[in-house]
Amino acid sequence: MEPKEGGSPQATTLKRNKDKTMAKTFKKILKPGEKKKKQKAIVIAAIKQLIHYLETNCIELEGICRISGNNTKVKELKKQLENGEGDSIDFSKIDSHCVSGALKAFLRDGDEPLLTFDLYKNFLASIDIKDKNSKISFIKSLLSALPKENYDLLQILLKFLNTIQLHSSINKMTSSNLAIVFSPTLLRPKEESLESMMTDSNSISEVVRVLIEEFHVLYEIKQTLLYQVSAIDLGIREDKRSTSEQLEDAKVTIEQLKKHLNEEARERSILETYCTSMEQKLQELEDINKSLTEEKDSLGELLNEFKETNKNQANDINSLKNDIKDVTEKQTKTELERDELNKVKVKLEKDIETTRIELKSTNDECQKLKVNNNKLGEDIKNQMKEFEQTRKSLLENHKLEFEKHQLEIQQFRQENEQLKKEKTDADLQLERVQAEISILLSSSNDKNSKKNSLKNQKKDLDNALKKCKDQESKINQLEKEKSKLQDELTKLQKSSSSSSSSSSSSSSSQASHKFVFGKKPSSSKITTTTTTTTSPAQQPTTPPPPLDEDDIISVKKFAFYYMNLAIKTDAMTKGLPCNINSSEILEELLSKNIKVQQWSEVISKKLKENK
């Protein structure tokens, strides 16, 4: 037996080597778990330290946690905190936006978000609950299902975010803005895709917003205590409590340590069983190595194929990254377009208000214009009535004057007939005188006896000759007066025909003297009254005064402007344009000698042409 036991030094060395290899493998197995725990503790301490600084110094900073700091400085700060150099860092010398950026980086770069991958769908399902109380109770149950570290750290973070949104009037960070910033870091799926990012982004931000706003209800903390206790009192600052409280905490920690020791004992038993199984597996592995060497050659081809597939997958990943960049750029563009549209909307609302005010003013002006037009129409109607009255009175005056002229003409005719009779009588007397002279000449022999009778007869002859001369002069005067009266009759007939034809235009000029341009309205009245009043008062010996052309032109101008005003007012009431150069039209009418009856047609044609 001894040679078997003592003759196995190689076996002892093999056992020692096996023990060493097993210890190394155990160390390799245990080290990753310990490293993860240490890293978790460092990350939690760093997050608490960052929250403490931001909560005490940067609550009222505008754009806190939204504005991103310098990327290189954020990475340097994160490395220092990961290396455990948090106590030596002076945060006052660092940009506060870089501090908030480091906080977001720690939350984003973790292996698993605080709300965990397993509860992702459950948190999204809470959005479909419409009742607020039932929604909060459901979310509270989900929070209780979280690991304790996640639960405590989430409490510190949500308290910090709640205090930020309470100062949103200063820092411009509402609960919705904070939810947009922190939703991708707190809640995300295990396998992200473009579709999930597009569809679930709004619902994720809504869940985080509810967590921020309902922090007091979810963690059952009174609002008064919230302002008395800061986030660091939950795990960073030194205890300033009584010994009894510290003892209670110590008891809790002892219980936790006991639980930890029990877990370690359980792990040791597991490792011992694992060692026995590993010894058995080592022999199996030696056999497997032989088979693996044989299969190695066959796996070369598979590796090449796998590399190609990896390349394709890398290309797909790059294309997906590019797509994500495009989507983010599109989102930024859409946000900018929304801002621009809102600005345009505000401008349009202002323009609409101004247009409404202008429309009101225009409506008021239109009403005023309607009132003025009504007044003008009434004035025009009154003027037309006055014009008709004056026209009737003028026509009556013309008729009376015409009748007077006819009576005078009849008187002149009667006087002319009397003068003709006197002339014939004078001719007869001349013949008689000549006969008497011939008789006297025949009886010239009886001079002496008849001297006295001859003298008397000579006197009679002289008287008769004087009478004949007087009668001839009277006859000549009467003939001249007759010719003048005939001329006056022709002129009066012409004037009466023109007055009757231009009764619609010239008589209106005599009715409304306010609208005469160039001459006073009284001049036309004076000329017409002088022609009518002087004719019956004149003696038959003096001729009537001739008509003045200036007066006729002034009457025509007055008639034109009155007609033009009436036609323009009709066009204004109908809403038609009435921009006409009246002076040019008047010159055309006067130069072409167009009748007054046709003036209204010419003016209306000009109005239609200017449309």
Curated annotation (Swiss-Prot):
Intracellular or extracellular location(s): Cytoplasm
Ranges where the Rho-GAP domain occurs: 24-219
SUPFAM superfamilies assigned to the protein according to its UniProt record, in alphabetical order: GTPase activation domain, GAP (SSF48350)
Source organism: Dictyostelium discoideum (Social amoeba)
Listed GO CC annotations: cytoplasm
SMART domains in the record: RhoGAP
Protein name as annotated: Rho GTPase-activating protein gacN
Ranges for region Disordered: 476-550
Composition skew (Low complexity), residue ranges: 495-509, 527-540
Pfam families tied to this protein: RhoGAP
One annotated GO biological process: signal transduction
PROSITE patterns referenced in this protein's UniProt entry, alphabetically: RHOGAP
Residues in coiled coil: 236-499
Comp. bias (Basic and acidic residues): 476-491
Annotated positions for site Arginine finger: R66
Keywords: Coiled coil, Cytoplasm, GTPase activation
Entry's Gene Ontology molecular function annotations: GTPase activator activity
InterPro entries documented for this protein: Rho_GTPase_activation_prot (IPR008936), RhoGAP_dom (IPR000198)
Protein's job: Rho GTPase-activating protein involved in the signal transduction pathway.
